């Protein structure tokens, strides 16, 4: 294939311009210059359009639905390194580790969102389809980092179900239709229904999103490879709200090696703010674009935290550590977050809490405060929130 053939394959360039610009040995003079100019113009148009396309990389459907970001926010996430997208033709290069095929099913990495605390990895699955409304299942083996032990607090995964949350808080499929109701299989389950998802995308593929929370939050996880081992695909039958049957329909081996490229962007503040309870202070707040960590110091240390006689006292103290609800920006906007885990460090006499965003990303240059809710006394009224300034 020569340069002329490549340009013809780009449908947005008029083939007539390409033919007119082709070298013609018998022609001389100014007309030949015109042909060269047309060829240069065609190439310039190609580069301009390709550059513009790169600035607006298509995000995965699941992350688009979860975060509902503006184009500017997506562009900032890409420029900072928080978001990395993998076009299908790139992921499926032989021996890249970004794609695997077995039993007619291909699994490829589509997009990652990674900061110092956590990672979201979106996989595209081609060749495995289920009827609409049937919840897919993936059997995932042990996850390792660079072939070694997984260092994290946990991992969860879910398939994109095609159900969106509208501005008024109601639900709809992507085409605007209200979602169809499903019913749990156990007759004695009190819950009436759930919503049936549309898991097949227009091209017939599915998306599976995996979320990892790192144990080491100093950035040492970035740059490593996460080895993922999938051993089967099937379906899930929901029997109750937290009770389901998983059936593997296709067994195989899909091994991926996913580079943890992300951002170390972080702000760390030391508010030393005494909370209303009077015996707990927020000492340190470290915040990244999509997750972060907080340290609360107790006035009186808890002794023997793991002993049965002090378990009740420890649980009571945990209930008194407020729940983080949002990161507040300088313009008054609240970015909703939720705490993912809470643990006591006896040697430091502090509780450590990690949190993640639930929508949108955090503009670190605009952070002004943290919003907390008392776990025991929260009334649901904004005026009862605990506001901790950190700017």
Q: In which residue ranges do the predicted regions lie?
A:
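Disordered, charged N-terminal biogenesis/targeting segments of membrane/secreted proteins
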Residues: 1-33
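Generic ordered-secondary-structure signal
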Residues: 3, 17-25, 38-39, 43-50, ...
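Generic secretory/membrane-interface signal
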Residues: 8, 38-40, 162, 197
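Alpha-helical, hydrophobic structural elements that either
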Residues: 55-391
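Solvent-exposed, non-transmembrane amphipathic alpha-helical segments
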Residues: 26-30, 54, 129
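Single-pass transmembrane signal-anchor helices and their membrane-water interface zones
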Residues: 10, 35-71
């Amino acid at each position: 294939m020569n340069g002329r053939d490549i340009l013809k394959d780009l449908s947005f360039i008029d083939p007539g311009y390409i033919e007119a610009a082709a070298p013609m040995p018998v022609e001389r003079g100014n007309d030949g210059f015109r042909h060269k100019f047309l060829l240069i113009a065609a190439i310039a148009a190609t580069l301009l359009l390709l550059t513009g396309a790169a600035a607006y990389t298509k995000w995965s459907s699941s992350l688009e639905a979860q975060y509902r970001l503006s184009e500017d926010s997506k562009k900032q996430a890409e420029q900072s390194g928080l978001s990395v997208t993998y076009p299908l033709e790139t992921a499926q290069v032989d021996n890249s580790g970004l794609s695997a095929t077995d039993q007619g099913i291909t699994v490829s990495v589509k997009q990652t969102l990674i900061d110092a605390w956590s990672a979201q990895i979106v996989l595209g699955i081609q060749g495995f389809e289920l009827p609409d409304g049937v919840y897919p299942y993936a059997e995932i083996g042990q996850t390792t980092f660079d072939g070694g032990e997984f260092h994290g607090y946990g991992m969860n995964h879910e398939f994109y179900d095609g159900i969106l949350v509208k501005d008024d808080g109601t639900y709809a499929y992507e085409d605007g239709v209200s979602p169809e109701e499903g019913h749990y299989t156990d007759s004695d389950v009190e819950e009436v229904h759930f919503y049936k998802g549309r898991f097949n995308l227009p091209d017939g593929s599915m998306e599976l999103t995996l979320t990892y929370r790192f144990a080491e939050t100093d950035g040492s996880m970035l740059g490593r490879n996460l080895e993922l081992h999938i051993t089967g695909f099937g379906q899930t039958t929901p029997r109750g709200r937290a009770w389901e049957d998983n059936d593997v329909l296709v067994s195989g081996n899909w091994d991926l090696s996913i580079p943890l490229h992300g951002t170390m962007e972080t702000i760390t503040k030391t508010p030393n703010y005494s909370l209303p309870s009077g015996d707990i202070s927020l000492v340190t707040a470290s915040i990244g674009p999509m997750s972060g960590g907080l340290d609360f110091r107790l006035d009186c240390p808890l002794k023997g935290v793991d002993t049965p006689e002090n378990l009740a006292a420890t649980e009571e103290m945990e209930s008194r550590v407020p729940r983080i609800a949002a990161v507040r920006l300088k313009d008054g906007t609240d970015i909703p977050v939720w705490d993912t885990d809470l643990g006591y460090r006896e040697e430091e006499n502090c509780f450590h809490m990690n949190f993640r965003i639930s929508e949108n990303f955090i503009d670190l240059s605009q952070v002004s405060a943290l919003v907390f809710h008392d776990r025991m006394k929260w009334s649901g009224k904004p005026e009862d929130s605990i506001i901790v300034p950190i700017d």
